[in-house]
Amino acid sequence: MSLRRSVLMGNFKEDDNVTTPLEGSRLERVERKDCPAEHLSDYDEVLRTRGMETMPHVFALLANSPAALAAVCPVGAHVRYGTEFDDALREYVIMTVAQELRCTYEWVHHYVVAKRVGASDDLLKKIGTPAMESEPGDIGLATRYARMLTRNEEIPDDMADALKASFGAKGFVDMTIMIGYYGMLARFINTVKIPIEDTYEIPPFNV
């Protein structure tokens, strides 16, 4: 039986999941067995919404504070899966944030996602550059907004108006929350020093 199926059925053996050290990190992974009973449904929901069989490092470390996991992960699920943004556009924005904050883990993971959803190789190489922000339409606008917001720069009225014109009030809110969420996650990752899994190649930052 797969771990995901076991999660959904609540069918775990005693030794299925044990909290384990993560080499190079400042925190240990919290596996399902060690998650407090009142937060097991939150732990399982992360697996369900992400379609994964094992908990990714970032969420397994976040689970050192189960209530934080319960509060943070639904926001991530919404901005990743519950918005109306084009998939490639979403990844350009996330990767802009990751590069600004020098979060290699987030950059690498979303590079893979970006390729999977059909992001352009040419545009992936432009992320964070003036050329990317000069792209016509939503791409240039959204990535410029992501960079400025991550740097805590003041957002001019004409940019806010353009974002609302392109994405509507709902999309403007979703875009802002998405940038903030991935900025928060990047800072957490960098602070607790989450190592990149051996199976990933590491494309360099563009800038």
Annotate each PLM feature.
Residues 2-207:
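Hydrophobic alpha-helical segments
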